[in-house]
Every structure is written in C-alpha cells, then in structure tokens.
C-alpha cells in the first residue's frame, strides 16, 4: 500500500506510524483511516515489530475526524452515516485490540476522534504543549468511541463531553490518568521510543497475554457492548442531523471552518481552562 496521508517505518522492533496531514492539523479523513488500517495490518503481521507508536507530524497530534471532508461529502441519513461511523470506530479500536502494545505520542491538539484514538492506546506520552478534548456536542455531533467514562469515570467524562471541553491541559490529563508521562516537546519522540524499547526487551508473548488480561478487566464489565451501544446512539444523532450541526456546516461551507468554529464558540460563556 502506498501511503499518502501517513508515514510508516520500522526501526529496532518499533513501528512508528505518523499521521501526516500537517496542513490540516492531521485531521483523520477517509484516506488516512484506510492507511492507518493498512499500517496496523503490517505492524501486526511483522514478527519483528514489538511495539506500535503513533504520532502526529508537525505541531499537532490530530484535530480529529475531518470536518472539511464531511462538509464536502454532505452525508445524510442513517444509510450514509452508518458505514462512516463504523469505519471511524473500527480504526480507533485497532489500537485497543492490537496484540502488541500501542503508544500515543502527543503534542499540540489531540481532539475528538483523535482523542479517542489516544485513549484506545495502551499508553500516552505527551509533550508539555499537548491539550485534549471532546468538543463534539458544542456543534451538534456525537461521540464515536465512548471510551472516556471507562478511563476517568462517569462524572468527569460527563463534564468533559457535555461541556465540549477542547482545552483540557496536559497536566489535568495526567491527573485524570489519561496521560502517563509529560515530557519536553523537543524530546517527545526520543522519550517515547525509549519507553517503546523498554517494552521491546520484554518477552512479546508475555506482553501480549498481559495486555489481554488488563483489557479483559474492562471488557468483562461490559466495555465492548457499551461501546457498540454508544455507537448506535451516535448513529441516532448523526443520521437525522441536529439543528446545531446543520447550522455549523452551513456556516463552514459559506465562510470556512474557522468562521464556523468562531460561531460555535461565541454561543458559550468563556470558562477557565483546566
């Protein structure tokens, strides 16, 4: 597979998957989702690969699923939205189900679907510039992969999701347990590879089985069924389309995404950043 929107290389048993649409803050479009799937196939099949690291090119991890692509394609109705949401969900969950450890290396914005991808990884190492969030409800969209309440608890997840938090600081993310380590921005890749190489020194079969055991502690409580139920609810949101989402997209088409985001944010009182 020829990659256009990601870069993929393997060195010293570490597969490095780079989201590479820096002009679009590495937004996850359909092509990128296909390429992530292809790269994960390669990493899982290659016995030399022991750890997968995902990072963003430039100064962002990713702004999430590509709103500009939605704006241009104009999906409407349940039949059009169902395969879109299913693909989004399945790609994010590749990192949860991958038999090899997965690490998200995050700098800058890590939002919406990209935030969900980082949550699906086994570890997240973040630069001091990183920030996180789930802004979807502020413009009438739903949550594709509802992992957050499983990792931070229902009360905090409701706060972040209901309020459309999009500037959750790296320090707060560390306090909540969704970031493992904060490192200087200039050393993000080096620090992440150091952790990855530590994992590479452990018997891969042992790591695989232990990952299964840890994931099972949540799956046994119903995580996978709950995620599928939440995905079905998201389809109920996106299928008919909300008034806010339609207004947001109309402004984006007429004036651009920056104008639509300004309209979105102007409707809400400014809150202290966390």
Task: Name what the model sees in each region.
Residues 88, 145, 154-157, 207-210, ...:
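A general structural signal for well-ordered alpha-helical segments in protein cores
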Residues 24, 28, 74, 168, ...:
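Ligand-binding pocket scaffold of soluble enzyme catalytic domains
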Residues 1-11, 165-170, 190, 194-197, ...:
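C-terminal alpha-helix plus adjacent terminal tail
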Residues 93-204:
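Crotonase-fold acyl-CoA enzyme core
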Residues 31-35, 87, 94, 191, ...:
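Charged catalytic carboxylate motif
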Residues 1-57:
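Conserved CoA-thioester-binding segment of acyl-CoA-metabolizing enzymes
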Residues 17, 21, 35-36, 54, ...:
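Terminal peptide-recognition signature
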Residues 56-91, 110, 256:
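Glycine- (often His-adjacent) and acidic-residue-rich active-site loop
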């Amino acid at each position: 597979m020829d990659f256009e929107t990601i870069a993929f290389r393997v060195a010293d048993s570490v597969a490095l998957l780079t989201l590479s649409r820096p002009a679009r803050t590495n937004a996850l479009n359909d092509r990128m989702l296909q390429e992530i799937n292809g790269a994960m196939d390669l990493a899982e099949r290659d016995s030399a690969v022991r750890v997968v690291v995902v990072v963003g090119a430039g100064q962002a991890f990713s702004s999430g699923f590509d709103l500009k692509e939605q704006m241009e394609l104009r999906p409407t109705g349940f039949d059009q939205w169902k395969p879109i949401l299913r693909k989004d969900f399945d790609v994010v969950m590749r990192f949860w189900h991958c038999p090899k450890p997965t690490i998200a290396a995050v700098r800058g914005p890590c939002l919406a679907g990209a935030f969900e991808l980082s949550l699906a990884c086994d570890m997240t190492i973040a630069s001091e510039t990183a920030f996180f969030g789930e802004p979807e409800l502020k413009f009438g969209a739903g949550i594709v992969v509802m992992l957050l309440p499983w990792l931070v608890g229902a009360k905090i997840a409701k706060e972040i999701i209901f309020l459309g938090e999009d500037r959750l600081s790296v320090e707060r993310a560390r306090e909540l347990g969704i970031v493992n380590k904060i490192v200087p921005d200039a050393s993000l890749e080096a620090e992440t590879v150091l952790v990855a190489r530590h994992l590479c020194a452990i018997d891969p079969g042992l790591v695989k089985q232990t990952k299964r055991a840890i994931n099972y502690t949540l799956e046994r409580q119903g995580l996978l069924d709950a995620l599928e139920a939440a995905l079905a609810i998201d389809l109920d949101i996106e299928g008919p389309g909300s008034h806010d989402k339609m207004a947001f997209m109309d402004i984006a088409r007429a004036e651009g995404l920056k104008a639509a985001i300004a309209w979105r944010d102007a409707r809400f009182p400014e809150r202290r950043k966390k």
